[in-house]
Amino acid sequence: MNNLIHDCGFFGKQIAGVYISRARRITASYNHIYNMPRAGICIGDGTWGGHVIEFNHIHNTCRETGDHGPFNAWGRDKYWCLSQSHMPYTIRRSHDAGLVKVDAMEPVIVRNNFFEEKSGWGLDLDDGASNYEIYNNLCVGVSMKLREGAFRTIYNNIWVNGANSPCFHVGNEDNHDRYFNNITVMTIAHQKPENDLNISMGESFGEIYTLIAVPANGPWLEQIDSNCFYSDLGNFVARVRFRQEQDDQNTDGKKAEKYSLEEWRKLGFDRNSVFADPLFVDPLNKDYRVKPESPALKLGFKNFEMGNWGLTDEFPAPWRN
């Protein structure tokens, strides 16, 4: 708690300001982390959970690596299926969702953090990371990625001008993932990652969702609803880059599927969501609360405190920078 961590990774690059692995009930809070070669905070596996990541301010990460962000998590427990996760996707599927809790016993809570970046993802739940509750986070310049995993509940977060749109990547059927009451604002002018080492979705600029290698037939998430999204494209677009197909392992040249909001709703998603300006109070001064007349409030979004991130007043003033 209350640590200033910066300019790490002089020799090793696969490091983090805070790294948690094979541990239980660890709290990382009120830290200011920046100038990292890779993630600011990383949870290295799904054993045994119960961690709390809160009130951290993290920025300037992934300066020497890619496909990451301020917060990264890997599952990689004994029920994570490498063959399903990495190409080709469908030789065999991962184990049923319920088994992940044998290792990921307690939910990991990620809340009330401020992540700002110019590339990658703010919250990257990768390689089977399971049993997470993520809420009240502000991500500017980045959003989130859910790779294969289960029992992730993501709600009441704000993603603004992400280098990549919220991404659901290599989903499993019946994963029990839920995504609701979030605000997404995508602006094409800001969706140009400056770090070429990191991953951007190319032509997805301005889209609300990007999905990659989703199940061929089954549901992609258990719930996606009651979200407020806005883009200067002027309309809602979700894109599925390709679906998993049991009889075809070659993904090259597959035609992407694009969905309007009406088409998206026919799939069972975002039936109560709205495409509208969320009406932030003062975004230029990092106040991303929404005004009383915001359509997001009518959907169930709740304002959360702004500015209470990073170092506390107890941190020695001469050491601040």
Give the ranges of each region predicted by the language model:
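Extracellular parallel beta-helix/beta-solenoid repeat domains
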Residues: 1-321
